[in-house]
Amino acid sequence: MSKMKTCKSAKKRYAFTSKGKIKYKKQNLRHILTKKSSKRRRKLGKSGLVSSFEVKRIKTLLPYA
């Protein structure tokens, strides 16, 4: 049987924590920042955790992670 392939885009977007949770970088922090409040920009700067119902789907994309 052949090896399972890793989805390269998912590999670049997601990272696993030591406890097994999946974290990602939030969107909307690249450009057009003047109209966004400092509170919103500060919250977007922190990494987010993937919700529990999406974890199974992401783990199928990353079989060796």
UniProtKB/Swiss-Prot annotation:
PROSITE patterns listed in its UniProt record: RIBOSOMAL_L35
Statement: the UniProt record of this protein carries the keyword DNA damage: no
Keywords: Ribonucleoprotein, Ribosomal protein
GO CC annotation, single: cytosolic large ribosomal subunit
This protein's record includes keyword Transport: no
Pfam family, one: Ribosomal_L35p
Superkingdom: Bacteria
Biological process per Gene Ontology, one example term: translation
Alphabetized GO MF terms: structural constituent of ribosome
Family assignment from sequence similarity: Belongs to the bacterial ribosomal protein bL35 family.
PANTHER family named among the record's database cross-references: 54S RIBOSOMAL PROTEIN BL35M, LARGE RIBOSOMAL SUBUNIT PROTEIN BL35M
Record's protein name: Large ribosomal subunit protein bL35
Organism per entry: Borrelia turicatae (strain 91E135)
Gene it is expressed from: rpmI
